[in-house]
Amino acid sequence: MTQATPPAKPVPNTQRGFLAWVERVGNLLPDPVMIFVWLIGFLMVLSVIGSALGWSASLPFSGEKPPSGGVVKDGVLTFEATSLFTEDNLKKLIVDMPRTLTSFAPLGVVLVVMLGASVAERAGLFSALIRNSLRDLPRAFLTPVVCLIGMTSHHASDAGYVVFIPLCGLVYAAAGRHPLVGIAAACAAVSGGFAGNITPGQLDVLLFGFTQEAARIIDPTWTMNPLGNWWFILAIVVLFTPIIWFITDRMLEPRLGPWTGNPDDDLKAELTKSVVTAEEKRGLAWAGIAALAVIAVFAALALWPGFTPLIDESQKGTAQLQPFYQGLIAAFTLIFLLGGIVFGVSVKSIRSSSDVVTMMNEGIRSLAPYIVFAFFAAHFIAMFSWSNLGPIAAINGAAALKELSLPAPFLLVCVQAFSSFLDLFIGSASAKWSAMAPVVVPMFMLLGISPEMTTAAYRMGDSYTNIATPLMSYFPLVLAFCRRWDKNVGVGTLLSMMLPFALAFMVAGMAMTAAWVYFDWPLGPGATVHYSLPGAK
């Protein structure tokens, strides 16, 4: 599949109204890295002010070991604001700078998973898997299948945008349906359904890394569970699929009318190339066997009688599974790595071990912007903890919310709404969550809401506004795909196609989040809506 190249400059905006304002304001924002530089500067000034004014926060505590920065006296845990310019904090900043970065949980997780994912992507496994999933589909069931594949394509890194979305335009055209309908449905699933998936994957590992850093501000023992949102993200797929199906087939397609154009020679050539070859089918079969082998090994390490390195026998209940949950990062990596290798060998995209190493190198090289971002995000979160402003904001914020007696479903919907508002201007899910998590995660823990539930609410809000803003990083690319079929498509045209999806997702997502909390449904294996702080009275 030929990869389209996004325009070098932002798409010109001749529209007026709210969305045009969003685009103009968003274009004025600096790079996420510079946002964190400014946040760090603001935090340093705020720490001096807080220390001078004697800011503090307290809560009852009966545990053995208080969180870092807290002091226990007479059964009360107290945090006092500390200037980041104290001798001790300056020493941490300067001497421990490398350690602050290397101990940043999301960075290590992303680097490890990318070693496998980069091989799978560059060997062609993800592309072939997506193309194979769309072949020989009945015309009437194109849309629901596109929804399911689109929301699971998040495992395939950028392939969902670069391969799947333009391919859907081709597939719809080949089925005699309007290609823009296919592109819109695919974009709604891939981008608007960003929070949904059938199984946990790289995004879960990444976001829970930030959640863990934030949760440990008040509970140093809290450890992430990559499966902690599994049932929630699966429910998103179940909820969003009929919504996309209805809007696509009943609203958007009648509005666009029948497609009367003819694909040019380049598009016909791409349609021909989208066919999965016999070699690729054989490679997919071997990749499936490799994935099953990895799953079998990990299952054996957890279930084999007398030999269970992935089970903590010293714990009870679901706590025994903590090593298994943490080992899933390695499992994802090996599934991608071995699947990519056997597929690449089958289709001859990998001819030697040096090809595998080269693919890994290219994958890590593509993470350079993220590593730069991680340096500043790691220091922001660490300095938030050193200054004690994180737990102070969480404790006082939780106390204020308790006084208001607002129901938990409403509070989490507010988190979701705030996340979706930020998403209009800042596209990066990790950038937004790394800034929000140090405040909202511990605050909601003190309100009895688990880090997993707060993360789920954030993910829902971060998802649906992706398709409602021209600042989404792939928006110019999707617009370019549309213009290959209709050169008159503009920013307003694409937004008008995607807004019905975004609005429907917003209403349904808020209702689902509120219902999940109200009925206290489990979020995933070993993950619940509610939480109790160890040692808190």
Q: Whereabouts are the PLM-identified features?
A:
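Hydrophobic core segments of alpha-helical transmembrane domains in multi-pass membrane transport
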Residues: 36-52, 110-118, 149-151, 189-193, ...
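Interfacial loop/helix-cap signal at membrane boundaries in integral membrane proteins
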Residues: 13, 17-20, 56-107, 217-225, ...
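Helix-loop-helix module between adjacent transmembrane segments
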Residues: 112-122, 130, 134, 140, ...
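Intrinsically disordered, low-complexity non-transmembrane regions of multi-pass membrane transporters
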Residues: 1-28, 57-85, 253-282, 529-537
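Membrane-core helix-loop-helix motifs of multi-pass transport proteins
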Residues: 23-27, 163-259, 277-283, 457-459, ...
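Hydrophobic alpha-helical transmembrane segments of multi-pass integral membrane proteins
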Residues: 110-111, 138-169, 174, 371-378, ...
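Core transmembrane alpha-helical segments of multi-pass membrane transporters/permeases
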Residues: 29-41, 45, 67-127, 321-391
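Juxtamembrane interface elements at the cytosolic ends of transmembrane helices
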Residues: 15, 123-129, 242-273, 300-313, ...
